[in-house]
Regions:
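Sec-dependent bacterial lipoprotein signal peptides
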Residues: 1-21
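Short, structurally constrained coil/turn elements
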Residues: 15-17, 70-75, 123
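Sec/Tat-exported extracytoplasmic proteins
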Residues: 38-45, 53-57, 61, 101-103, ...
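Short solvent-exposed beta->alpha transition segments
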Residues: 31, 46-93, 107
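Exposed beta-sheet edge and beta->alpha loop/turn motif
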Residues: 88-140
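Short, low-complexity N-terminal intrinsically disordered segments enriched in polar/charged residues
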Residues: 19-43
């Protein structure tokens, strides 16, 4: 094989390996972010959950004090991922999650479906939520 062809082949191989590593890292961080978010929601840590929301989403859809106070009335009793899909070459993910919430003031449990849209932020090297916190006023 000609030395130039050999160098080009090695370069192409190196680029493919680096792209694969990058993709695997994004996949791994997606799983970690989803697990962290699920844990925070299961413990009804609504303020911590808000830290997962993308700043640009918050600018357009700020969380009101009323929204946070309403969420604080509820304790999560169940969090079940019903479907998940990845788009845009692994940079966007959507999850449909069934969340059961118990309101101690009313002694009532309700079930909501939370449609989550996540996008990988390459600058921050983390997954951010682009769909807001669960809405306890939605009925299943």
């Amino acid at each position: 094989m000609h030395p130039l062809k050999k160098i080009i082949s090695l370069f192409v191989l190196a680029v493919l390996v680096l792209a694969s590593c990058s993709s695997n890292q994004v996949d791994k961080s997606r799983g970690e972010a989803f697990k962290q978010y699920e844990t925070i929601i299961r413990w009804s840590q609504w303020d911590a959950a808000a830290d997962f929301i993308a700043p640009e989403y918050l600018e357009e859809h700020p969380i009101s004090r009323l929204d946070m106070d309403r969420l604080r009335l509820f304790k999560v009793t169940s969090y079940t991922v019903r479907s998940a899909a990845v788009f845009d070459e692994g940079m966007t993910a959507r999850q449909e999650v069934e969340i059961k919430l118990f309101n101690a003031n009313q002694a009532v449990e309700r079930t909501i479906i939370d449609q989550q849209e996540w996008r990988y932020n390459e600058e921050a090297k983390r997954w951010l939520l682009h769909s807001g916190l669960p809405d306890p006023t939605k009925r299943y």
